[in-house]
Amino acid sequence: MYTPVDPKVDFVAQERRILAFWRERRVFEQSVAQRAQGKSYVFFDGPPFATGLPHFGHFVPSTIKDIIPRYQTMRGAYVPRRFGWDCHGLPIEHLIEQELNLNSKSDVESYGVSAFNAACRSSVLRYVKEWQRTLTRLGRWVDFDNDYKTMDVCYMESVWWVVAQLWQRKLLYEGYKILPYCPRCATALSNHELNLGGYQDVSDPAITVRFECTSVVPGSPAAREFCAAASWGSASLPAHTCFLAWTTTPWTLPCNAALALGPQILYVLIEANDEHYILARSRLEFYYPDSSAYRVVWEKRGEHLAGIRYRPLFSYPVFGQGPDPSVQGDSEEGLFCTRVADFVSTEDGTGVVHVAPAFGEDDYEVFKDAGISIQCPLDAECRFTAEVADYQGLFVKAADKAIIARVQKQGALFRREQISHAYPHCWRCASPLIYRAVHSWFVAVEKIKDKMLAANASICWQPSHIRDGRFGKWLVCARDWAISRDRYWGNPLPIWRCVHCGATDCIGSRTQLYERSGMLLEDLHKHVVDMVTIPCACGSVMRRVPEVLDCWFESGAMPYAQQHYPFEHATDFERYFPAHFISEGLDQTRGWFYTLTILAVALFERPAFENCIVTGLVLASDGKKMSKALRNYADPNEVMDRYGADALRLFLVRSAVVRADDLKYSDEGVKDILKTVIIPLWNSYSFYVTYANIDGIDPPVCAKVDGMGQAVTRLATHLNNPLDRWILSLTEKLVQDIACALDAYDVSKVADPIVSYVDQLNNWYIRRSRRRFWKSINDEDKRCAYNTLYCVLKRCVLAIAPVVPFITESIWQNIRAADDVQSVHLADYPVCTPMVRDDALEFKMETVQRVVSMARAIRAQCNLKVRQPLKAMQVITRNPMERSALLEMEEDVLDELNVKELVFHEKEDEIVEYRAKANFRVLGKELGSKTKRAALSIERLSSAEIQEILEGTTLYLDVDGDRLELTEEKILVQRIERESLKAINEGTLTVALDTTLTEDLLLEGAIRDLVRGVQNLRKERGFSLVDRICLRVFSSDQDIVCARKAYDLHRSYIVGETLAAHVQWARVRDGASAVYVKSDAVLWEVSIDKA
């Protein structure tokens, strides 16, 4: 006997019981240990920060990161699942700064680096318990006890080894480049971090500035073009001519060094209001909408205008060139003259770009090889330094107003406006970033770019477009990676520099540091290693450079550092690298996926992972980003406590988010999965257990459902009922579909087969087989029904266990055989048995279901419920296989639709008349202006002619002398039902119902309504499925004649359907309560009692 099943189970409470079962029996640990001799399957888990609580963005990859390892484990693989924590970097530093009220780097240093790092260490894992509790509640199996932390000394040492390897391979260098810089965090960021913080719309001042031309550089293109030396004032070069340059960063004007022109852009010199300006021809209309307001003097391409000198707006010593930098340098290599650059565009502004090489990557490239010393006159918090004396100490963005005022006072302000544009912000503190020239240490990514592209080509991405799309394109444009940060709580960059000769060296281990310094350290953090000095060959000492590593470098090194490689696992590293599988969100194409790839290729010339599932972004239901401030989403823990984790998991993997698209989350989606999958599956299981207990059925002969499916094959050979063979075939299809999807790492194809299968099992197989379980005789057909339902339930549970682990465990615990493993997650995954698949039978049942669906649609249109019998259904099909299927399964069709007769016709025109209209979308391409005349001819086609076209015969029409070949796709066919018939067409099938209702049909429908009412009454009274009843039936006075007639005709049907031991035509006894059941023909009066 099975434990009785509550059909109204509390899934949330049940899931908590399963969690307790897993915990007490250590089922996860068993699942890993029992496969220890199996093939090793490597899974890398990207380390999250534990400084915040998990949210929906973590739930999507976490679900996938549970499904795949569960599946691989059931397939026999050894799959350790070690969790990890990202402990260093800006996230925790920013949090601690807020808590300690430290507002700048100077505040941190005043507080003390050692104390600050101690505060970071003590707080970095503050939400670990919440993470463990939440992910465990989701059903995710992962090893928290053996987790790795990026702040552990062994992890940090392996990261040092990685840095040393890059150093030895000449892939690490020190440089000075333009990088995005956070003034709040006072450190540079990598280009790949820009997308992590996102772009926000901001309003900035945009000004157009006059730069007055003074002369031309001898030998320059401009000198050749104008045949001028140093003078400016000829007819073609009027005095006081100005270039108009546009900028959205007025604060960079004190550092202006040049004006950039597009070499192929057409520029004009115009005269307007006795003034002369040079700007791009295509931008004239924006600045001068009235063309009569100016006169064009000449037009020239930018390449001919290089070398025109202009008067600088400011003369601050920011270029190391002396008091008058405008006269320094040879020809056009000097400052304050025009230069050509390919980055100049005419999408906005004037087509003339103000160049400040200390504040723009393109600007910096203009002067990269000019031999001019570029200085950045900003301090660590982006305030002007003494070089820009007038604005010293002022934050650059705050200086905009004063600088604009000064430009206006000088008469150089041509136009001022306010613009809104997208601007990058810091990914941790959300401050606007500043592009500025900074010192940093770089990984020479561009040297290995081709190898990275080759590695990417070997990776299986899901969705596949990521490989050559978002990730591949990012790799094509990959630039050297700035890995140093001017911060405190991080892994120190292990490079020492001599204070005297400047020699540098990289340390790759604690042992090497001990050998060089005599100090063996158990903590490698900044406040410790900064105290360690190393003797230099020159006789002086080497001190560590001050920077720490980008935390993304540490997460990219996790394949090696989590194993303490190469200090441990040096001989069996191939067992742990590369990963067979990883999964994270789309943003990690710029983050973890990228850093993993860089380091794996740099160290081993291979990818770090073989398969990657990329997920999209989970948005609130209104399409906005989920926000605590806006309160526009539910806590995911509350969702699980309302609907259960299984429903949430299946909802997520069925959504677009697993295809790297955005998901607008709504509780309704989870609720729908609960109603359409979880509850129906439970009902199927409940049905089996309930009737098996009634009949005393123990687990059938096929109880041991082994992975190879021999028992299923044996069962299939003994089944005669098509329904049994069909659901068995469909179960094997489910197994095959899920396995194929998971083998291909395409989780987007996992959910739909489950949804479809549960619907077929519950709403077709069990419903169509219900009478076989009801009957009192335990004959062969009944035994086959039990064996089949048991077998398919068990194989279904095994197949979907990785996806919905809770409900499958609950079912398994009750229906497993005595010699089965104690948990479904310790079992082998079922292997599809091709011999059991029956494609022909699946097609036949699909055809039956199509016809049933079409006929039900007709009933709905005519307001005819299925309990109302109908005389006949007419069917026409142009597919002989469909006709054969319907003939073979005619009894099922008639019973399902409550129709007395199934009539086949050869031609559709036997039940409908045709009318046709032109398909303008198709004909318009062929006939053009003659289409309307062809349409008139098509509307005059007879029903017989249209029938010929539908049967494949080609007709021809004469359209103004042109011969039109008329085929089915060129016409739109309307079907007009003949009298009393209602028809519907779908592809090769046409179905019609005779909706005429005779007295006998109406009476039989009334009896079916009566039976339905009695069944509902049994449920309301709490009667069991086997309880026999005493039934009294009567009717209202006005219906009594037809009611009694219906009762007499169908009394035996009433008895059989309601389990009535006694049935009487009589009024309800005095004192008893009557229930009234309404049908279209009769108002029934009913009372029941247990027999």
UniProtKB/Swiss-Prot annotation:
Its main location: cytoplasm. A motif ('KMSKS' region) lies at residues 625-629. It catalyses: tRNA(Ile) + L-isoleucine + ATP = L-isoleucyl-tRNA(Ile) + AMP + diphosphate. ATP binds at K628. InterPro entries: aa-tRNA-synth_Ia (IPR002300), Anticodon_Ile_ABEc (IPR033709), Ile-tRNA-ligase (IPR002301), Ile-tRNA-ligase_type2 (IPR023586), M/V/L/I-tRNA-synth_anticd-bd (IPR013155), Rossmann-like_a/b/a_fold (IPR014729), tRNAsynth_Ia_anticodon-bd (IPR009080), Val/Leu/Ile-tRNA-synth_edit (IPR009008). GO terms for molecular function: aminoacyl-tRNA deacylase activity; ATP binding; isoleucine-tRNA ligase activity; tRNA binding; zinc ion binding. Pfam families: Anticodon_1, DUF5915, tRNA-synt_1. GO terms for biological process: isoleucyl-tRNA aminoacylation. Keywords: Aminoacyl-tRNA synthetase, ATP-binding, Cytoplasm, Ligase, Metal-binding, Nucleotide-binding, Protein biosynthesis, Zinc. GO terms for cellular component: cytoplasm. It is an enzyme of class 6 (ligase). A motif ('HIGH' region) lies at residues 48-58. Belongs to the class-I aminoacyl-tRNA synthetase family. IleS type 2 subfamily. HAMAP family: Ile_tRNA_synth_type2 (MF_02003). Monomer. PANTHER family: ISOLEUCINE--TRNA LIGASE, CYTOPLASMIC, SOLEUCYL-TRNA SYNTHETASE. Catalyzes the attachment of isoleucine to tRNA(Ile). As IleRS can inadvertently accommodate and process structurally similar amino acids such as valine, to avoid such errors it has two additional distinct tRNA(Ile)-dependent editing activities. One activity is designated as 'pretransfer' editing and involves the hydrolysis of activated Val-AMP. The other activity is designated 'posttransfer' editing and involves deacylation of mischarged Val-tRNA(Ile). This is Isoleucine--tRNA ligase. It comes from Treponema pallidum (strain Nichols). The lineage of its organism: Bacteria, Pseudomonadati, Spirochaetota, Spirochaetia, Spirochaetales.
